[in-house]
A protein has these predicted regions:
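Cofactor- and metal-binding active-site motifs of prokaryotic enzymes
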Residues: 1-206
Length: 206
């Protein structure tokens, strides 16, 4: 099975329906393939818990990570004050995720909590990548990355970023499966048969 990636975006007044609509668009883009990972980026104007419920009404128990945002985009363009969902379907990845709290006080403990129970190696999937999404107001980006790298080694590829809140700088939230928390870090670990590649910047104009 080839790896497929599809996106959807939606906005509106009902947080559950907005999440569901964005997920529905992404599901249609997979053309019937089952999702292996859901990525959700949600404007702070929405109720995060309701958005996640809407997404998971379609993706079910698929591993889900995400965060609040200060603007999002898909390949179709910029999507301000919206919910954006990306779905990956693949048989060449093994995906796990966890969330750790108390990031401000102890990044080490938060990362340890997030990674608890996640295997460091999986036979047949030699490459390791991690998507690190953290409370953008905690100010612990460097520490969080270093702690994750220390767990998986120098060969691990690290991606991710900090949660936003439409530039209000009041509260930022990260998401892991059905949990939406502040002062936390959400980490998705991907073991893959081939290395994952990262990109910097995008093709959209301001």
């Amino acid at each position: 099975m080839a790896t497929k990636f599809a996106t959807g975006s939606s906005k509106g007044d009902n947080s559950f329906e907005v999440g569901k609509n964005a997920a529905q668009q992404a599901m249609e883009g997979l053309s019937g393939a089952e999702p292996s990972l859901a990525l959700v980026f949600c404007s702070s104007v929405y109720d995060y818990d309701e958005v996640v419920k809407g997404v998971r009404s379609l993706t079910k128990d698929t591993v889900l990570v995400g965060s609040s945002s200060a603007g999002a985009f898909t390949e179709k363009g910029v999507a301000p004050k919206s919910v954006v969902v990306g779905l990956i379907s693949t048989d060449t990845y093994k995906v796990h995720a966890g969330i750790g709290t108390g990031l401000r006080e102890s990044p080490a403990k938060a990362v340890e909590e997030a990674l608890k129970g996640i295997p460091t190696t999986i036979e047949g999937y030699p490459h390791i990548s991690a998507i690190i999404l953290q409370d953008g107001l905690a100010g612990k980006g460097e520490e969080t990355s270093l702690m994750t790298a220390a767990t998986f080694g120098q060969e691990a590829h690290l991606f991710g970023g900090a949660a936003g809140d439409e530039l209000e700088f009041k509260a930022t939230t990260v998401i892991c499966n059905d949990k939406c928390l502040e002062d936390a870090v959400s980490i998705c670990v991907i073991h893959s048969k081939r290395p994952l590649l990262g990109g910097v910047k995008h093709g959209h104009k301001a």
